[in-house]
From Swiss-Prot:
GO terms for biological process: DNA-templated transcription. Mg(2+) binds at D454, D456, D458. The gene is rpoC. In this algae the rpoC1 (beta') and rpoC2 (beta'') genes are fused into one ORF. This seems to be the result of evolution acting to reduce protein size rather than horizontal transfer from a bacteria. Thus this is considered an atypical member of the bacterial RpoC family. This is DNA-directed RNA polymerase subunit beta'-beta''. Binds 1 Mg(2+) ion per subunit. Binds 2 Zn(2+) ions per subunit. Zn(2+) 2 binds at C804, C859, C866, C869. It comes from Cyanidioschyzon merolae (strain NIES-3377 / 10D). DNA-dependent RNA polymerase catalyzes the transcription of DNA into RNA using the four ribonucleoside triphosphates as substrates. NCBIfam families: rpoC1_cyan, rpoC2_cyan, rpoC_TIGR. Its cofactor is Mg(2+); Zn(2+). Pfam families: RNA_pol_Rpb1_1, RNA_pol_Rpb1_2, RNA_pol_Rpb1_3, RNA_pol_Rpb1_4, RNA_pol_Rpb1_5.
C-alpha cells in the first residue's frame, strides 16, 4: 500500500501512456475515433468506439469480440482476427482510452475559477483569457513595435486597421486555446517568480494581496516540475467504459451514462473539425468548429460551468465528470466514504424486557439469511451436504438440523445494531444475538437512550462482523455493556427511565392512605417482608425495623434524623416501608439504605456511584436488576391515567384574584401616567408569570398532601415522563404564550387542559404549537449539517503521542468538571503535575479556588493532541488511549445534542417562562450607605432607581451590626444612600449576562384632543427629560380642503351653528350628472348605434368591439392577389398516431360523408395528399377539384376556369378562377374562393374629442395554410376608440342601452361627507355648466355647545363640549387652582374620588370644572412625533417608546448562534472595540501615551471610565476577528510575535468556549469542555504570514503557529478560521475535496502538486486503508 498520494497535471504523453497498448501485430490501440457505442443488431461494442473491446478489454470474461477464443485456457492471447485480448472483463473498469484532439482546448477548471489559473499565470484578467479562448478576440503573441504590446487584445476590426498601418513592422497574433498555449510555453517560471518577489518587496498593501496570490501559485507550481502549457489539452482521456455503463432495460431500450453523450459530442465535433481541415475549409468555419469543440470539452469536464448547460432528451442537464465527483450523490460521499454493506438486514424494533443488557433478539428468519454461509459450512463439515447447492436445499426445506446449527453458529457471534440517524458512536453497538420468533428485532430497554430509539415503529439495521478481528473488536470495544458512559459528558447513558422509574418510585413511595393505626416494630428486614407476604402490612405501611449500626442510611436532605432513626439502648431502629426494604435488598445494597422516595435522579446517582465504586460488571448487573424491579412494580401499581386524576387545586381562584388585583393597580398607575406602556406590559407579564409559578407550587403541595400516588403526580415527580410545566398546563393554567415572532401576548391563558380552553385561548395557543412543529422540521437538517462540518474539521485530530512537554495550561475552577483533566502544575503534596484528576483528588483540592490544568488548547504537539493534554476518556473514566480519534468524538458530542434540542422544541408548545433577574434583598433592618457614582434610571416596572457607574460596596448598618454587599458597575439600586429599610426589602437588581436587544413600542392616542407637555423636554424629537404627554379631550372636526372658517379661535358655539364651508366647483365646461356618492362632469360624449353583429368588450380599453367576416367552407391555402383574398380550399387533418393512416393512400379519391379521417367525419370530396416533415407523415390534406392523369401543362397557378377547362373538354365549372398544380402523374385543378380585400381604416362616428375608427386585418399571411377541416373566418374587423391628444383627460366610461353604446369623457369628484358635514346642491341634474362654477356648498355644522380650538397647520378644528368637562361640587372652600392636574383615583374631598384624570379649567368657592385628559408617561430616549399644542385624533401615532428586551433563548436562536460562533461569522451590526487601554473622554478613547481613538456610535460606557483593549464601547455584537487582532497588536511589543499570538488565541478560546457552553447550558445540555476545546483548537491554530523571514514559506500562506514558532524574523498575524474554512484548509486535499467545493480543491491541489500524507481518517477510508486510529493505528 502507498504511504502518500500526490496529484499533478498530466502531460499529453502521460495521458497517451495510460491508454496506449501495442498488439502483437505491431498495431497501437487506445485512441477512440468513433462516436458509436454498440451495434444495434448484434448489441456488441463497435470497434474504435466508446465501448471498443480492442481498447478497453472484452465484455465477457475470457472471450474475444469475434468469438474465436472462448475459455480461460486462452488467457493472455490477443485474437489475430479482432485484436481483442482474452482476459477478465473487469479490466474494463481500469483500462482507459484517449481522443486525439484536432485542435487544442483549454481545461475549464483552470479557465473558470475561482481563481482562473490561466489568467494568473499570464497576468491577464480572466475575461480577457476567455475572450481569446472562445474566439472573440485576438491576442498579440510577439511584437516589434510599441504600438502593440504582447498579451494585448485586439478585435477583428482593430487587427485589420493595425495590419494596414504596420505593414512594415510585423507582429504576431493568435486566437483560441492555441494562442494561450503559445503564451504559456513562452513563460519562464523561475524568472517570473524572481520578478514577483522583487515587486512584493516594494509593493503597497493594495497590490500585495494579488502579488502574494500569484507568487504562491507560481512558486508551488514550479516545484511540481510540470509545464504550464499542459493546462491546454491536446489529448483528452476517455475513462473506462464500466465507469460510464450502458445497460439494457426490460423493454429492449438502453439506459446510458450521460458521459457517453458528452464524449459522443466531443468525438463528433473533433472528427468534423479534422474533415474540415483536410478539405481546407474557410478559416471562419474552422474557427467556429474549434469553438464548438472547446464547448463540448467544457461540457464534458464541467457542464454548466460556462454558458448554458447541455441538456439531454428530457431537458435535464447532463452529468459531467465534475458532477460525478461532487455533492452528496458524488463519487466521494456516495461510493468512497459511504458504501452499501453486505451481511446486513433491517427490521422494526420491539422491546425485549427479558433480555440481558448485552443481548438482543434476532428474528430466526433474518439470522438464517445473515448467517447462511456459516450454516452451509457447518452442514458440509458435518457431512450433511456434499456441496453448497445441497446445503442450500436443506436450508430451504427448513429441516430441524438447520435450527440446531443456526443456534450453534449464532451463539458466540456478536452482531452490530445501528439506528439511523447515527449521531454519535453509541448509535452502533454490539450485542449477543438471541434467536426469537416473529419478524421484529428485540432491543433491551436500557440502551434506548444511546440509540435515541423508541418503539413507535423505529427500524434498526443489523450487521454481521465477519473476520475474527472484527468480532473481537465488537465484543471488546462495542458490546453494549462496555458503552456504559456517554463520551460527551461522562455520565451514565444506561439509565432506567419511564416505566422502570415509575416502578421504583411506587415501590418506595409514601402513601398516607395505607398507614396502620399503631406502630409496628420488627427484628429485621426478613420479618418485615414475611409480614408483607402474609398481607399483615402493605407495601407502603410505615414500620420500625431493627438495623445494623454500620448501615449507611440515606435520608431526604430536608429530613430530621430523629423522625426516622431511634436509638434504644445499643439497638438502632429505622422507620421505613416494606417497599424501601425490597429496593435495598434487590438494588441498592452496594451503596446503602435509601430511606426516601426514589426518583430518576436518585437512580442516576445510584448507578454512577456503583460504577465508580464497583466497576462496570456490577453497574451492568445493577442496571438489569433495576429494570426487572421497575417493570415488576410498574405492573403491580397498574398506573392508568383517567380524567378524574387531573385534579385542579382549589386555591387557583384565590391566586387569580390576587393577580387580577395587582394588574388593576398597574393599570391605574398607567392611567395616572406614572408608568409607561412598556413598564405596564412588563409588570402585567411578570404578575402572570408569578401567578403561574405560585399555582405550580400550589399544585405540587396539593398533590403531595392529598394524593401522593396520583398518576399525574407520580409521572412528573418521579422523572418518568413529563415535567412540572406540563402538569401546570394540565391542572393549573397554560399561562403566557408567544406569538409567531416570539413576542409575548399579554393575555394569559387562565384555563388548563382539564377545564378546557375557550375559543380565544385556543387560537392564542395554536401559534406556539405550530411554530414548534415548523421549527423542528426546519432545524433538524441544519443540525445534521453542523455535525458534518464539525466532523470534517476535527477528523484528523488523533492522540498520537504521550506528552508534548508543554508547561502551559488553562485555569479552571475546582468543580466536578475537573474530573478527567491533568494538572499542569503542582498544587500540593497529593496533587502533582501530570496527574489525572479523579473524584478522590477533588477532596484534596477543595480548599483551592482554581487550578491550572492541561488542555487540548495549549497542547504543543503538531497535527495531533498528546495524551496528557487531553486527559481522561470520559466514556471509560481512565486516561485516554493512544490513537483515540478524539476529534470525531468531540464533533459528535457537540453535534448530537444540537439535533436533540431541535427535536425537543415543540414539547412545551410555545409556553413562555419568564427570565427572572437576579436580585439582592436586605438581610436585616437598618440604614443603607454607599458612595459610588450613579445616575438615575427606572426599573422595568417604572420604579425610581439608580444605576451604578462604578463598582461600589454598599453597607447595611443596625445597632453595631454591619453587612457589606459588593456591587459591580451596571447594578440597579432601588434605595438611596441614607434610606432606612426593613428586613427582606429589595435592594438591587444585579447586572445579567443575558443578551439584550433594542425594541420599540408605539404609543397611540386613545381619544381626540389637544396635546400638552408636562415636564417633558425634547431635542429633535428625542425625549431628553422624562415627563407626561397629556391629551385634553375634545371633539375633532376635519375641515374640508379649501374651506372658509366662519368662527374664531376660543369662540363659544351653539348647536346647528355653521363652523366652516367650502364650494365644490366644476373643473371644465360640461354637463353635470349627480350620483349617490360622486358627481360626474361630462365633457364630451359619443353615441354609436349597433346595426351589425359586433361583439362589444366590457372594458374601456382602446379596442372596444370586434367582428369576424369572410367565412370559408373549409381550410386551405390563402393568397393575397389584386387587393383581394383568394383561398384554394383543402380540408386539413393533423396526424397524431399511426392509426390515423390506416387505409389512406396518397393520390386516393375520397367521397364526402363516406368515412372518418383522424376520428372526424370527412365532409369534403377530394384527393388525398400526405404531407411529410422529417420523413414522418404529419398531415392529411383532402384537395377538392378535377384530377387529370398523365397530363402536363405550363399553365400552373391561378388560371381563368373557362379558358383552361374548355381546352380539356370540361364545360361546367362554377368558379371563375381555378388553381392548377402538378399532382402524382398529372395535374390537379382546384376551385378558388375570392373574398374582398382589407380596407383602409375608416371613421364611423366622431365628436369633439372622441372618434370611433374601423380597422380590418386578414388573419393569415400570403401562401399560409389554414390548417382546419371546418369553416374558418379570414377577416377580423375591430372598432377602436380614439381620444384626441389635446383632450383635457383620457378617462372614458361606457354606457350600454339596448342597441346603442355611449362613450363619455368625464371628470369624477367623490363626495365623502365626514361627521357633522352637510351638502347643498347649487345646480340641477343634467344641467350644462361653464368652467369654475360652484356646483355644491359643503358646510361643517356644530352638534353641541362648546368652545372652538383651531390648528391652521393641521386643518383641524377641536370643539371642547360639555361632554369633555366634569364638574365636581365640593361644598366647601378648597385649594384647587386653574391649571392643576387631577389624576384618576385622587381624593378631591371627603368621599369624593376622581373618576378620570384631567386639568382644572374653572373654579369658584364650592366647585371646580375639570377638562378630561388622558396622560402618557414618556421615558428618556423615546421618539416623540407630536409637539406641545398639536391637535390629535383618536388612533394618531404619538410616540415610540425605546426599551431593551431579553433575546429569547430557545434553541431556534441557539443553533444559529452555535453556528455563528463556530463559523466565526462577522456580525452585521458589530460594536466598536477599544483598540488599546485608555480612558473615555468626549466621544473618544485616550491612552496613557497620548493615542486617540475616535468613537462613532452611541457610547455604552460612561465618561471618565477606564477601559481595557478589546472592550466594547458602543452597542452591538463583538467581532471576534477584530477582538483577536486588537489583543495580538497590544501584546506584540511586550511579548514578541509567538507569545503574543498564543496569548491572544488563549483569550479568544476562553471567550468562545464560554459562549458555546452558554448556549447549550441554557437548554440544559451538558457537554464536557474538552470537546469544545478540540474544535476551537482547529479554529485557532494557524497564522497568516506577512513576511516569511528565513523560512521556506510564502507570504500570505496559512501555517500552524507551532510549526512557525522555531523560525526567526518571521512576521505574521493570528487568524480565526470558521469550521468550514478550517476543514477546507486542511493539509489533506482528499479530505477537503470530499467535504465541499470538490472541483476547486482538486484543481488547486493539482496546480500545487500537493502530497496527501494520509494522516486523517477520511483520506484513509477513501483510499480503502485501515484508519490510523484505534486498532488501525500503526503502533498496534
Amino acid at each position: 500500500m502507498c504511504d502518500a498520494i500526490q496529484i499533478r497535471l498530466a502531460s499529453p504523453e502521460r495521458i497517451r501512456s495510460w491508454a496506449e497498448r501495442v498488439l502483437p501485430n505491431g498495431q497501437v490501440v487506445g485512441e477512440v475515433t468513433k462516436p458509436e457505442t454498440i451495434n444495434y443488431r448484434t448489441l456488441k461494442p463497435e470497434m474504435d468506439g466508446l465501448f471498443c473491446e480492442r481498447i478497453f478489454g472484452p465484455v465477457k470474461d475470457w472471450e474475444c469480440h469475434c468469438g474465436k477464443y472462448k475459455k480461460v485456457r486462452y488467457k493472455g492471447i490477443v485474437c489475430e482476427r479482432c485484436g481483442v485480448e482474452v482476459t477478465e472483463s473487469k479490466v474494463r473498469r481500469h483500462r482507459m482510452g484517449y481522443i486525439d484532439l484536432a485542435a487544442v482546448v483549454s481545461h475549464v477548471w483552470y479557465l473558470k475559477g475561482p481563481p482562473s489559473y490561466l489568467a494568473l499565470f499570464l497576468n491577464m484578467s480572466s475575461s480577457e483569457v476567455e475572450q481569446v479562448i472562445y474566439f472573440h478576440s485576438y491576442v498579440v503573441l510577439q511584437s516589434t513595435t510599441e504600438l502593440v504590446q504582447p498579451k494585448q487584445l485586439l478585435s477583428e476590426d482593430e487587427l485589420i486597421i493595425l495590419e494596414e498601418r504596420l505593414a512594415n513592422q510585423p507582429f504576431q497574433v493568435g486566437i483560441g486555446a492555441q494562442a494561450i498555449q503559445y503564451l504559456l510555453q513562452q513563460l519562464d517560471l523561475d524568472m517570473e517568480i524572481r520578478v514577483l518577489r522583487n515587486q512584493l518587496f516594494h509593493a503597497k498593501s493594495s497590490k500585495r494581496e494579488k502579488l502574494m496570490k500569484r507568487l504562491r501559485i507560481l512558486d508551488n507550481f514550479a516545484s511540481t516540475g510540470a509545464d504550464p502549457s499542459w493546462m491546454i489539452l491536446s489529448v483528452l482521456p476517455v475513462i473506462p467504459p464500466d465507469l460510464r455503463p450502458m445497460v439494457q432495460l426490460d423493454g429492449g431500450r438502453f439506459a446510458t451514462s450521460d458521459l457517453n453523450d458528452l464524449y459522443r459530442r466531443v468525438i463528433n465535433r473533433n472528427n468534423r473539425l479534422k474533415r474540415l481541415q483536410e478539405i481546407l475549409a474557410p478559416e471562419i468555419i474552422i474557427r467556429n468548429e474549434k469553438r464548438m469543440l472547446q464547448e463540448a470539452v467544457d461540457a464534458l469536464m464541467d457542464n454548466g460551468r460556462r454558458g448554458r448547460s447541455v441538456v439531454g432528451a428530457n431537458n435535464r442537464a447532463l452529468k459531467s465528470l465534475s458532477h460525478i465527483l461532487e455533492g452528496k450523490q458524488g463519487r466521494f460521499r456516495q461510493n468512497l466514504l459511504g458504501k452499501r454493506v453486505d451481511y446486513s438486514g433491517r427490521s422494526v424494533i420491539v422491546v425485549g424486557p427479558e433480555l440481558k443488557l448485552y443481548q438482543c433478539g434476532l428474528p430466526k428468519e433474518m439470522a438464517l439469511e445473515l448467517f447462511q454461509p456459516f450454516v452451509i459450512q457447518r452442514l458440509m463439515a458435518q457431512g450433511l451436504a456434499n456441496n453448497m447447492k445441497a446445503a442450500k436445499k436443506i436450508i430451504q426445506r427448513k429441516e430441524a438440523i438447520v435450527d440446531q446449527i443456526l443456534h450453534q453458529v449464532v451463539k458466540a457471534h456478536p452482531v452490530l445494531l445501528n439506528r439511523a440517524p447515527t449521531l454519535h458512536r453509541l448509535g452502533i453497538q454490539a450485542f449477543d444475538p438471541i434467536l426469537v420468533d416473529g419478524r421484529a428485532i428485540q432491543l433491551h430497554p436500557l440502551v434506548c437512550a444511546a440509540f435515541n430509539a423508541d418503539f413507535d415503529g423505529d427500524q434498526m439495521a443489523v450487521h454481521v462482523p465477519l473476520s475474527v478481528e472484527a468480532q473481537a473488536e465488537a465484543r471488546l470495544l462495542m458490546l453494549s455493556v462496555n458503552n456504559f458512559l456517554s463520551p460527551a459528558t461522562g455520565d451514565a447513558i444506561i439509565m432506567p427511565s419511564q416505566d422502570m422509574v415509575i416502578g421504583c418510585y411506587y415501590l418506595t413511595a409514601n402513601n398516607p392512605a395505607s398507614q396502620a393505626k399503631q406502630s409496628h416494630y420488627f427484628a429485621d428486614f426478613e420479618h418485615v417482608l414475611m409480614a408483607f407476604e402474609q398481607k399483615q402490612i402493605n407495601l407502603h405501611t410505615w414500620v420500625w425495623v431493627h438495623v445494623n449500626n454500620n448501615l449507611n442510611i440515606i435520608l431526604e436532605r430536608s429530613a430530621l434524623q430523629e423522625d426516622w432513626i431511634q436509638t434504644r439502648g445499643e439497638s438502632l431502629f429505622l422507620k421505613t416501608t416494606p417497599g424501601r426494604i425490597i429496593f435495598y435488598q434487590q438494588a441498592a445494597y452496594h451503596v446503602g439504605f435509601y430511606n426516601l422516595t426514589i426518583n430518576k435522579s436518585h437512580l442516576k446517582e445510584l448507578v454512577k456511584t456503583v460504577y465508580n465504586l464497583k466497576g462496570m460488571a456490577c453497574a451492568t448487573q445493577l442496571a438489569d436488576d433495576l429494570k426487572q424491579l421497575g417493570f415488576h412494580y410498574a405492573t403491580t401499581c397498574g398506573l392508568s391515567l383517567g380524567i378524574e386524576d387531573l385534579r385542579v387545586a382549589p386555591s387557583k381562584q384565590k391566586i387569580f384574584q390576587w393577580a387580577q388585583q395587582a394588574i388593576e393597580k398597574t393599570e391605574q398607575l398607567w392611567q395616572r401616567a406614572q408608568i409607561t406602556h412598556v413598564e405596564k406590559f412588563h409588570k402585567v407579564v411578570d404578575t402572570w408569570s408569578e401567578a403561574s409559578e405560585t399555582l405550580k407550587q400550589e399544585v405540587v403541595r396539593y398533590y403531595e398532601h392529598t394524593d401522593p400516588l396520583n398518576p399525574v403526580y407520580m409521572m412528573a415527580f418521579s422523572g418518568a415522563r413529563g415535567n412540572l410545566s406540563q402538569v401546570r398546563q394540565l391542572v393549573g393554567m397554560r399561562g403566557l404564550m408567544a406569538d409567531p415572532h416570539g413576542q409575548l401576548i399579554d393575555l394569559p391563558i387562565l384555563s388548563n387542559f382539564r377545564e378546557g380552553l375557550t375559543v380565544t385561548e385556543y387560537l392564542i395557543s395554536s401559534y406556539g404549537a405550530r411554530k414548534g412543529l415548523v421549527d423542528t422540521s426546519l432545524r433538524t437538517a441544519d443540525s445534521g449539517y453542523l455535525t458534518r462540518r464539525l466532523v470534517d474539521v476535527a477528523q484528523d485530530v488523533i492522540i498520537r503521542q504521550a506528552d508534548c512537554g508543554t508547561l502551559r495550561g488553562i485555569a479552571v475552577p475546582v468543580s466536578k468538571a475537573l474530573i478527567g483533566r491533568v494538572l499542569a502544575q503542582d498544587v500540593n503534596e497529593e496533587c502533582k503535575r501530570n496527574q489525572l484528576i479523579t473524584a478522590d483528588m477533588l477532596v484534596a483540592l477543595r480548599d483551592t479556588k482554581q487550578v491550572i490544568v492541561r488542555s487540548p488548547l495549549t497542547c504543543e504537539a503538531l497535527r495531533c493532541i498528546c495524551q496528557l493534554c487531553y486527559g481522561g476518556n470520559l466514556a471509560y473514566g481512565h486516561m485516554v488511549d493512544l490513537a483515540e480519534a478524539v476529534g470525531i468524538i468531540a464533533a459528535q458530542s457537540i453535534g448530537e445534542p444540537g439535533t436533540q434540542l431541535t427535536m425537543r422544541t415543540f414539547h412545551t408548545g410555545g409556553v413562555f417562562t419568564s427570565a427572572q433577574t437576579a436580585s439582592v434583598r436586605a438581610t436585616l433592618d437598618g440604614v443603607v450607605t454607599y458612595e459610588g457614582r450613579c445616575k438615575s434610571t427606572r426599573t422595568r416596572y417604572g420604579q425610581e432607581a439608580w444605576l451604578l457607574e462604578t463598582s461600589t460596596p454598599l453597607f447595611l448598618q443596625n445597632d453595631g451590626q454591619q453587612h457589606r454587599y459588593d456591587f459591580q458597575a451596571g447594578t440597579v439600586l432601588l434605595v438611596k444612600s441614607g434610606q432606612r429599610v426593613k428586613f427582606n426589602t429589595l435592594l438591587a437588581y444585579l447586572p445579567t449576562s443575558t443578551r439584550f436587544e433594542k425594541a420599540t413600542k408605539s404609543v397611540d392616542a386613545h381619544n381626540a384632543g389637544e396635546v400638552v407637555f408636562d415636564q417633558l423636554k425634547l431635542e429633535q424629537n428625542l425625549v431628553k427629560k422624562e415627563g407626561i404627554l397629556w391629551i385634553l379631550s375634545g371633539q375633532m372636526l376635519h375641515l374640508p380642503a379649501g374651506s372658509e372658517l366662519l368662527v374664531s379661535n376660543e369662540q363659544q358655539i351653539k348647536p346647528a351653528q355653521v363652523l366652516a364651508q367650502s364650494y365644490l366647483r366644476s373643473r371644465a365646461k360640461g354637463i353635470v350628472q349627480i350620483h349617490t356618492n360622486q358627481v360626474e362632469l361630462i365633457l364630451d360624449r359619443l353615441s354609436f348605434e349597433v346595426k351589425e353583429p359586433f361583439h362589444f368588450h366590457s372594458g374601456d380599453g382602446q379596442i372596444i368591439a370586434e367582428k369576424f367576416e369572410h367565412q370559408t367552407p373549409t381550410g386551405g391555402q390563402v393568397f393575397h392577389r389584386n387587393g383581394q383574398i383568394w383561398l384554394v380550399p383543402a380540408a386539413i387533418y393533423e396526424v397524431s398516431s399511426q392509426k390515423d393512416l390506416v387505409d389512406i393512400k396518397h393520390g386516393q379519391f375520397i367521397l364526402a360523408n363516406q368515412r372518418s379521417i383522424c376520428g372526424v367525419k370527412n365532409e369534403l370530396s377530394g384527393w388525398v395528399q400526405l404531407v411529410k416533415q422529417n420523413e414522418v407523415i404529419k398531415e392529411i390534406r383532402i384537395r377538392p377539384g378535377i384530377y387529370l392523369p398523365k397530363v402536363k401543362t405550363n399553365q400552373l397557378g391561378f388560371v381563368q376556369s373557362h379558358l383552361l377547362l374548355s381546352s380539356y373538354g370540361i364545360n361546367a365549372y362554377t368558379r371563375r378562377f381555378c388553381y392548377v398544380e402538378n399532382y402524382e402523374q398529372g395535374i390537379l385543378i382546384s376551385p378558388v374562393y375570392v373574398f374582398a380585400g382589407v380596407s383602409p381604416p375608416k371613421i364611423v362616428a366622431k365628436s369633439r374629442w372622441l372618434s370611433l375608427v374601423m380597422y380590418q386585418t386578414c388573419m393569415f399571411q400570403h401562401q399560409q395554410w389554414v390548417k382546419s377541416y371546418k369553416k374558418v373566418y379570414l377577416m377580423r374587423c375591430q372598432l377602436q376608440l380614439k381620444v384626441a391628444p389635446q383632450a383635457p383627460l383620457n378617462q372614458v366610461t361606457v354606457h350600454k342601452e339596448k342597441n346603442r353604446r355611449e362613450w363619455r369623457l368625464s371628470y369624477f369628484s367623490n363626495i365623502k361627507l365626514q361627521a357633522f358635514q352637510t351638502i347643498k346642491w347649487l345646480v340641477k341634474n343634467h344641467q350644462r355648466v361653464e368652467a369654475d362654477v360652484p356646483l355644491a356648498l359643503i358646510q361643517l355644522v356644530s352638534a353641541f355647545n362648546g368652545i372652538v380650538r383651531y390648528h391652521p397647520m393641521l386643518n383641524r378644528l377641536l370643539v371642547v363640549s360639555d361632554q369633555d368637562v366634569i364638574t365636581y361640587s365640593i361644598g366647601k372652600p378648597h385649594h384647587f387652582q386653574i391649571g392643576d392636574v387631577i389624576r384618576i383615583g385622587d381624593q378631591i374631598s371627603h368621599g369624593l374620588v376622581a373618576k378620570t384624570s384631567g386639568f382644572v379649567i374653572a373654579r369658584d368657592a364650592n366647585q371646580i370644572q375639570v377638562r378630561i385628559a388622558q396622560g402618557y408617561f414618556l421615558s428618556r430616549e423615546t421618539i416623540c412625533y407630536v409637539k406641545d399644542g398639536d391637535l390629535v385624533n383618536e388612533g394618531d401615532h404619538l410616540a415610540s417608546l425605546v426599551f431593551e428586551q431579553v433575546k429569547t433563548g430557545d434553541i431556534i436562536q441557539g443553533l444559529p448562534r452555535i453556528e455563528e460562533i463556530l463559523e466565526a461569522r462577522k456580525p452585521k451590526n458589530s460594536c466598536e472595540l477599544a483598540q488599546f487601554d485608555g480612558v473615555i473622554q468626549e466621544q473618544s478613547l485616550v491612552s496613557d501615551d497620548g493615542r486617540v481613538q475616535a468613537i462613532k456610535g452611541t457610547l455604552i460606557v460612561c465618561e471618565g471610565t477606564r477601559v481595557q483593549a478589546g472592550e466594547p464601547l458602543t452597542d452591538g455584537a463583538v467581532n471576534a476577528h477584530e477582538w483577536l487582532q486588537i489583543h495580538f497588536n497590544n501584546a506584540v511589543p511586550y511579548r514578541g510575535m509567538v507569545e503574543a499570538a498564543r496569548e491572544s488565541f488563549a483569550k479568544l478560546q476562553a471567550k468562545l468556549l464560554h459562549q458555546v457552553q452558554q448556549v447549550y447550558k441554557s437548554q440544559g445540555v451538558d457537554i464536557a469542555d474538552k470537546h469544545i476545546e478540540v474544535i476551537l483548537r482547529q479554529m485557532t491554530s494557524k497564522v497568516i504570514l506577512d513576511d516569511p523571514g528565513d523560512s521556506d514559506f510564502l507570504p500570505g500562506q496559512l501555517v500552524y503557529l507551532n510549526e512557525i514558532a522555531s523560525y526567526k524574523h518571521v512576521i505574521f498575524h493570528p487568524v480565526l478560521l470558521g469550521i468550514t474554512k478550517a476543514a477546507l484548509n486542511t493539509e489533506s486535499f482528499i479530505s477537503a475535496a470530499s467535504f465541499q467545493e470538490t472541483t476547486r480543491i482538486l484543481a488547486q491541489a493539482a496546480m500545487e502538486g500537493q502530497i496527501d500524507q494520509l494522516r486523517g481518517l477520511k483520506e484513509n477510508v477513501i483510499m480503502g486503508r485501515l484508519i490510523p486510529a484505534g486498532t488501525g493505528a500503526k503502533y498496534l
